[in-house]
């Protein structure tokens, strides 16, 4: 990912009077509903860690409110995903390894009402992306535990034409940007049909009835548990405990897997905005590996990983 100063990004934009600052919340509300109100097709580029890829998307809102969507990577190995109402129907290529909670195009599911406590929201200017007029919003974190965004929203539909994810220094971590967007006609049926290599995805292998007996003793302010479940490990017969957390915009997941005495070391890595931190937790049954994966700063992920405890121990 190329480094870009947030000040330079914002300084090149037209200033908006302070009296319009309250409109930022209105635009975020439009963004939150845009993909359920607009059919479209287009091409966008994705940049992370200096690597670029180009994707085509077909997105159709049906008369009953259901949303059908197909994404196809246009360069490199063929990669495709088809979804209905956010549920993956089929997938192919390397996307199969990126499926869990992956953000495959520039719309993030969030609750606008939660954001004002943890982010400063401002209209900072106007721009033009993919030949379409846009308004520019700065979403700046109030602490060091989350990243900031610069959002260029289509004036006509509220759809995100460009999204920049920025660290605390204003450096670019991730970019989505449409190069072409057509909202004038809904995609045809054949454009939503999967290719022959797209593999049907079965029901998730999770046991939602089992209680997850783990919790975090520390969370970044504003982050709450959004889901907890047990799933089967892809490499062992052991169940893996899964906890997901979010603040209304940012999110991360915690996975706890038995080690049975295996000697596995701690690890940490970052690719663009995504961090992976693994910490060994000593327990009487041979240890557990705690792994935090998400789009939060590395130090935050490490602190969460170190705070994971068995439920009974955490309540003492």
Swiss-Prot record:
The keyword Signal applies. GO terms for biological process: alginic acid biosynthetic process; regulation of polysaccharide biosynthetic process. InterPro entries: MucB/RseB_C, MucB/RseB_C_sf, MucB/RseB_N, MucB_RseB. One of its GO terms (cellular component) is outer membrane-bounded periplasmic space. Keywords: Alginate biosynthesis, Periplasm, Signal. Residues 1-21 form the signal peptide. One of its GO terms (molecular function) is antisigma factor binding. It is found in: Periplasm. The keyword Signal applies. It comes from the Bacteria. Belongs to the RseB family. PANTHER family: PTHR38782, SIGMA-E FACTOR REGULATORY PROTEIN RSEB. Negative regulator of the sigma factor AlgU. Plays a role in the differentiation of P.aeruginosa into the alginate-producing form. Inactivation of mucB causes conversion to mucoidy. This is Sigma factor AlgU regulatory protein MucB. The lineage of its organism: Bacteria, Pseudomonadati, Pseudomonadota, Gammaproteobacteria, Pseudomonadales.
């Amino acid at each position: 990912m190329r480094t870009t100063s947030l000040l330079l990004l914002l300084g090149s934009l037209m200033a908006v009077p302070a009296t319009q600052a309250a409109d930022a919340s209105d635009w975020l509300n439009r963004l939150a509903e845009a993909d359920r109100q607009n059919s479209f097709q287009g091409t966008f580029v994705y940049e992370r860690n200096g690597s670029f890829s180009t994707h085509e998307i077909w997105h159709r809102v049906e008369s009953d409110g259901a949303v059908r969507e197909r994404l196809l990577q246009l360069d490199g190995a063929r990669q495709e995903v088809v979804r209905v109402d956010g549920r993956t129907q089929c997938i192919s290529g390397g996307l199969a390894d990126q499926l869990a909670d992956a953000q495959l195009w520039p719309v993030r599911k969030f609750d606008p009402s939660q954001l004002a406590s943890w982010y400063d929201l401002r209209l900072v200017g106007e721009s033009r992306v993919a030949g379409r007029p846009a308004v520019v919003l700065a979403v700046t974190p109030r602490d060091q535990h989350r990243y900031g965004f610069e959002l260029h929203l289509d004036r006509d539909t509220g759809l995100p034409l460009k999204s920049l994810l920025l660290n605390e220094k204003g450096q670019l971590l991730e970019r989505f940007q449409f190069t072409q967007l057509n909202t004038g006609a809904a995609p045809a049926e054949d454009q939503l049909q999967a290719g022959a290599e797209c593999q049907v995805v079965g029901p998730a292998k999770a046991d939602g009835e089992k209680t997850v007996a783990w919790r975090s003793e520390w969370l970044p302010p504003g982050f709450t548990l959004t889901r907890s479940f047990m799933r089967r490990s892809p490499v062992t017969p052991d169940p893996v405990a899964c906890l997901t957390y979010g603040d209304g915009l940012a999110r991360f997941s915690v996975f706890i897997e038995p080690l049975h005495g295996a000697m596995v070391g701690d690890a940490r890595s970052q690719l663009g905005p995504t961090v992976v931190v693994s910490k060994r937790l000593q327990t009487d049954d041979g240890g557990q590996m705690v792994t935090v994966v998400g789009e939060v700063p590395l130090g935050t992920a490490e602190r969460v990983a170190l705070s994971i405890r068995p439920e009974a121990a955490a309540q003492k």
